[in-house]
Swiss-Prot record:
Record field: transmembrane: 44-64
Cofactor(s) named in the record: heme
Primary enzyme class: oxidoreductase
UniProt EC number: 1.14.-.-
Position of the signal peptide: none
Family affiliation: Belongs to the cytochrome P450 family.
GO CC terms in record: membrane
Function, in words: Cytochrome P450 monooxygenase; part of the gene cluster that mediates the biosynthesis of the isocyanide xanthocillin and its derivatives. The first step of the pathway consists in the conversion of tyrosine into a vinyl-isonitrile intermediate by the isocyanide synthase xanB. Subsequent oxidative dimerization of this intermediate to form xanthocillin may involve the cytochrome P450 monooxygenase xanG, whose expression is coregulated with that of XanB.
Name this polypeptide is given: Cytochrome P450 monooxygenase xanG
């Protein structure tokens, strides 16, 4: 067997190690050493590969841990918040399975929402404490919580989620246009008639007895009514071919992008949008919406002013434009408040109308009684005085808002200093708190054993009794479709009128039932139509 000697590259020199003689290796030993070296490298690679999931697990454990200083409340399992990744369960189903019992027993729970553990409240006295103490439980929307996110890019800093002097500035400018005593009902009736025309045409095209989807028409109606009542714009979404009014068509895209469970519950992922093509597109859509809306509004108003055309009535858009032009609002503040008017003034109505078609479509007794009351007026041109005098119509709208609150859950307040909610729940500063309106409204301890039933009669017999209970339950924190106290929705009067006018026209001209394959799905902030069809027969 031949021996070999491993020498350094430098010729004619003997390589001397610091210790021992020059290295001599037998060929067999050499290959064995190489094998050992490869095995060591393989093990090292395996260790590295194993450390990656371990590091991820450790990071998630840190990211998802409940801060030690949060109150000792029942904790809703983290996975409940991300069920949408693999489950089609609606929020009403999720509430019944995981939230109802702890919330009704304790009044508040810890829940994972928008990238952090927050406190969700449903007990009325706790809600009242939170609503009344605006300086302690300050409004803080996505622009404060997750300012880098897609949703923050969409809504920005606006009259709904701002606080302090900024909120006072916005309210001083916008309140007269949002809380008018006498809204013009002509646009409401005009668009409601067009809406009924469109769904009847769709039904005739589909054939009698065949179900049709109405959500597209509902959104078009809601956008058109919003435009004519708040922005001095007739977008004509109902009149023009579907999808040609960009400001309306883009709303469906926005809704789909906002409520993707992964990004909704892990908004930190939006900070890596440069790696995620779908999030890049989401940011583009949000910017397109804001830029298009601002250009459309200013273009219309400037054109009218150049022609000497004065608006028929002062709307919130005119107040915003004046404040922007005289420097009270920055361009961003102007745009953010335009967007929030557009979004809330159409989406809440849209979701409530979807719920209306669902509930009244499967409740023939209510539909028949309501139609009889409407037809008894002997008019086809209802005014605000006419619809506001109808007790059953009023009760139906109130009950729809109770069982189907358009904003079913919202966590957009933060403690500015350590707090003691209801004098019993200690909350550290910087904790986000919110409410679940659906949970409040279906609590049998508040609304009785029939809390889950659609029962308009619970509101009373006369319009006066109904208004009194509406106010009483709102003050108590037991009825919160429009929030309560100083931050209650400024547009609630308009929403009630809008719904009554639409219901009047729909019930006057249409009878309908719900298609057996249709399903209503409840999302964290509103209701959306889910698979299935709605049958509408004239």
């Amino acid at each position: 067997m031949t021996w070999m000697r491993v020498m350094p590259r430098c010729q004619n020199r003997t390589y001397k190690r610091p210790r021992g003689p020059p290295l001599s290796i037998h060929p067999l030993e050499f290959f064995q050493a190489k094998k050992v070296e490869k095995t060591a490298k393989a093990k090292m690679i395996l260790y590295y590969l194993a450390s990656i999931p371990l590091a991820i697990i450790c990071y998630l454990a840190w990211y998802l841990h409940v801060p030690w200083d949060l109150p000792s409340l029942p904790r809703i399992p983290f996975y409940v918040s991300i069920l949408g990744l693999w489950s089609s369960m609606g929020q009403d189903e999720i509430y019944e399975r995981w939230l109802r019992k702890p919330l009704e027993a304790h009044g508040a729970v810890l829940i994972w929402f928008a990238g952090r553990w927050s406190i969700l409240v449903t007990r009325p006295d706790l809600l009242t404490d939170m609503f009344r103490n605006e300086d302690l439980y300050a409004k803080a929307g996505s622009q404060k919580k997750i300012p880098w996110s897609v949703i923050a890019t969409l809504v920005g800093d606006n009259i709904i989620n701002s606080h302090g002097d900024t909120w006072k500035l916005y309210t001083g400018i916008m309140k007269p246009g949002l809380q008018k005593k006498n809204f013009d009902t002509a646009p409401l009736l005009l668009k409601s008639r067009r809406f009924v025309d469109e769904i009847l045409a769709e039904q005739n095209s589909a054939g009698r007895g065949t179900g049709i989807l109405v959500n597209t028409f509902v959104q078009q109606w809601a956008v058109d009514v919003m435009g004519m009542s708040f922005l001095d714009l007739d977008l004509q979404s109902l009149e023009k071919p579907h999808g040609t009014v960009r400001l309306e068509a883009i709303q469906s895209v926005i809704k789909l992008m906002l409520f993707r469970p992964l990004f909704f519950n892990f908004p930190d992922l939006d900070q890596f949008a440069w790696l995620i093509k779908s999030r890049q597109r989401a940011y583009e859509i949000m910017h397109e919406f804001g830029d298009t809306l601002m250009a459309t509004v200013l273009g219309r108003i400037d054109s009218d002013r150049e022609k000497g055309i004065k608006p028929a009535e002062e709307m919130v858009v005119h107040m915003l434009v004046d404040a922007y032009r005289d420097g009270r609002l920055t361009e961003k503040q102007f745009k953010d408040n335009l967007k929030i008017v557009f979004l809330t003034a159409h989406e809440n109505a849209q979701q409530l109308v979807n719920s209306m078609f669902w509930e009244i479509g499967k409740n023939n007794e209510v539909q028949t009684r309501l139609r009889a009351e409407i037809l008894s007026t002997n008019t086809t041109t209802p005014t605000s005085e006419v619809v506001n005098a109808l007790p059953y119509l009023t009760a139906v709208v109130y009950e729809l808002l109770r069982l189907y609150p358009p904003v079913s859950q919202l966590i957009n307040r933060v403690t500015v200093r350590p707090a003691m909610l209801g004098n019993e729940i200690p909350i550290p500063a910087g904790t986000f708190v919110g409410w679940n309106a659906y949970g409040v409204h279906v609590n049998p301890a508040i609304w009785g054993p029939d809390a889950n039933e659609f029962k308009p009669e619970r509101w009373g017999r006369t319009v006066g009794e109904m208004h009194a209970r509406f106010r009483r339950e709102t003050v108590r924190g037991t009825y919160i479709p429009f929030n309560a106290h100083s931050r209650k929705c400024l547009g609630q009067g308009f929403v009630l009128l809008q719904m009554k006018i639409l219901l009047f026209e729909v019930l006057r001209r249409i009878e309908w039932t719900v298609d057996p394959g249709y399903r209503l799905k409840m999302t964290p902030v509103s209701y959306f139509l889910e698979s299935g069809r709605k049958s509408t027969d004239a």
